[in-house]
């Protein structure tokens, strides 16, 4: 799976090529063989909060695939207050890392934080997020209860991600889940030009440090 946008930056960067295991959550119509099955999935295993998942866009499932992080499972109440994430009334912890920057963006902006919340197994899950702008569009959202058989997704680049906070997506039904992103196989050094178009830096074509990089 090729990362087409910076919505999961800094975890995943534009130009990363990611290995996805399509058996992680059972099989459905979006799985490798696209075979007709009884119901929407077989051998379903629910993703855990914190998993990075590839899924089909419910509007155009055959044309567009998305990759985001699971922050809500069925029954969870999701809320965002002043950019802080709350799951079932508990605020996800944030620890400051440093100023945000990426070669996919023209300017350094915002800050990186280590975000921690509890997964279904009771263990804490940690990942880095990018909070770029004060009072951004989705800095306040909900509360929203995740419906049965649905998942709530958010991008790690919180102010530059169209995800379940958007009215055009909201929670995604499990039938659209394709698989779990496991690691970056290799990474092309894609930079964003002043008009926001992606350009491959042929003078320095690869991000060698991202080869075989695990995704957490």
Q: Each predicted region: which residue ranges?
A:
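Aromatic-capped interface at the extracytoplasmic side
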Residues: 1-8
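Soluble "head" domains of membrane/secretory-pathway proteins
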Residues: 10-216
